């Protein structure tokens, strides 16, 4: 089986199912049973269970990197066993560039072509960031007995309501036939916490996650937030974590710019957000830094 562009179908799979038992294998086995030629790419299966904001971060950048036609099967399903149903949506995407506005490298594959992608997820906010960043063309409730069991296993909706229908879609089942079309206000979103501008030149945000296993500290302050304040590489920043841990350092393009091993560095993560690290060492672990703590940035 090939898609209309001549490639084998692709499912990129993210879950909170972990890697210590056969749960992920069951989902993949079901995908392969429905769509034997599918290529399954693991995104992540060790996200914090039920944390839709963390999951949303892992799936928002993928259309810039995956071939058109990819189906993104993404799930954390705390409402398993209820009347909840998944949502499937199509996005169109034509974009170049990563965090710094262009790809590092000149290979032909780095210029993204225009194409469409399908996301399938619980309707619990997991697609909030995807919709904000990419918009969507159409969205449907996943309810047709042609793509989900009439009596789904009540404790395993990630398999029954995400993995199974994603395989049908990868195999060519029409998106518009998975269920009724959803109005925009029927798609659940979580409230995003954007950075706040204080006193015209200070930014206040928070730590979104620790970049394991390196111990780098990622924030919700985007490159564009910094650019509005005239910040570029070399601009001196005073950054305070959790109100008590100060750093004074310039924004740098690489870890090596910190100089000696263990020195602190402020940089843009691969996703385009302000981050803090130590050169070839962990910043988060010695200070026991966690997601959710405050970040204050003063320029100059």
Swiss-Prot record:
The organism's superkingdom is given as Bacteria
Q: Which reaction is the catalytic activity of this chain? A: fluoride + S-adenosyl-L-methionine = 5'-deoxy-5'-fluoroadenosine + L-methionine; chloride + S-adenosyl-L-methionine = 5'-chloro-5'-deoxyadenosine + L-methionine
**Iron as UniProt keyword:** no
Question: Which residues are noted in the entry as S-adenosyl-L-methionine-binding?
Answer: 16, 21-23, 77, 158, 211, 216, 270-271, 278-280
GO MF, one term, reads: adenosyl-fluoride synthase activity
InterPro entries in the record, alphabetically? Fluorinase, SAM_HAT_C, SAM_HAT_N, SAM_OH_AdoTrfase, SAM_OH_AdoTrfase_C_sf, SAM_OH_AdoTrfase_N_sf
User: What's known about how it's activated or inhibited?
Assistant: Activity is severely inhibited by 1 mM Cu(2+) or Zn(2+).
Q: Which enzyme class, named as a word?
A: transferase
Q: Give the EC number.
A: 2.5.1.63, 2.5.1.94
What's known about how pH impacts activity here?
Answer: Optimum pH is 6.5.
Outcome (variant: residue 158 to A): Loss of fluorination activity
Please tell me whether the keyword tRNA-binding is annotated for this protein: no
Keywords in alphabetical order: S-adenosyl-L-methionine, Transferase
Family per record: Belongs to the SAM hydrolase / SAM-dependent halogenase family.
Please name the PANTHER family in this protein's record. CHLORINASE MJ1651 (PTHR35092:SF1)
- Subunit comment: Homohexamer.
Q: What does this protein do?
A: Catalyzes the formation of a C-F bond by combining S-adenosyl-L-methionine (SAM) and fluoride to generate 5'-fluoro-5'-deoxyadenosine (5'-FDA) and L-methionine. Probably involved in fluoroacetate (FAc) and 4-fluorothreonine (4-FT) biosynthesis. In vitro, can also catalyze the conversion of chloride and SAM to 5'-chloro-5'-deoxyadenosine (5'-CIDA) and L-methionine in the presence of L-amino acid oxidase.
Output this protein's name.
Fluorinase
UniProt source species: Nocardia brasiliensis (strain ATCC 700358 / HUJEG-1)
Q: Which gene encodes it?
A: flA2
């Amino acid at each position: 089986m090939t898609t209309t562009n001549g490639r084998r179908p692709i499912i990129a799979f993210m879950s909170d199912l972990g890697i210590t038992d056969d749960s992920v294998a069951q989902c993949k086995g079901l995908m392969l049973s429905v769509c034997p030629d599918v290529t399954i790419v693991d995104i992540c299966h060790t996200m914090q269970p039920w944390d839709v904001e963390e999951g949303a971060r892992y799936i928002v950048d993928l259309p810039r990197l995956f071939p058109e036609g990819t189906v993104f099967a993404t799930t954390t399903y705390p409402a398993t066993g209820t009347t909840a149903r998944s949502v499937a949506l199509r996005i169109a995407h034509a974009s170049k560039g990563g965090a710094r506005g262009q790809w590092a490298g000149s290979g032909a594959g780095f210029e993204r072509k225009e194409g469409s992608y399908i996301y399938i997820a619980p309707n619990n906010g997991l697609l909030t960031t995807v919709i904000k960043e990419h918009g969507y063309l159409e969205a449907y409730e996943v309810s047709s007995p042609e793509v989900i069991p009439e009596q789904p296993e009540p404790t395993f909706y990630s398999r029954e309501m995400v993995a199974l229908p994603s395989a049908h879609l990868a195999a060519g089942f029409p998106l518009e036939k998975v269920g009724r079309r959803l109005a925009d206000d029927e798609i659940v979103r979580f409230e995003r916490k954007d950075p706040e501008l204080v006193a015209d030149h200070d930014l206040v945000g928070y730590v979104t996650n620790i970049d394991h296993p390196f111990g780098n500290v990622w924030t919700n302050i985007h490159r564009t937030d910094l650019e509005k304040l005239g910040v570029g590489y070399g601009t001196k920043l005073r950054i305070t974590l959790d109100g008590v841990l100060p750093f004074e350092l310039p924004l740098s393009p690489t870890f090596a710019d910190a100089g000696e091993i263990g020195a602190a560095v402020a940089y843009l993560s691969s996703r385009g957000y302000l981050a803090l690290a130590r050169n070839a060492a962990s910043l988060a672990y010695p200070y026991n830094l966690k997601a959710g703590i405050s970040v204050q940035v003063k320029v100059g």
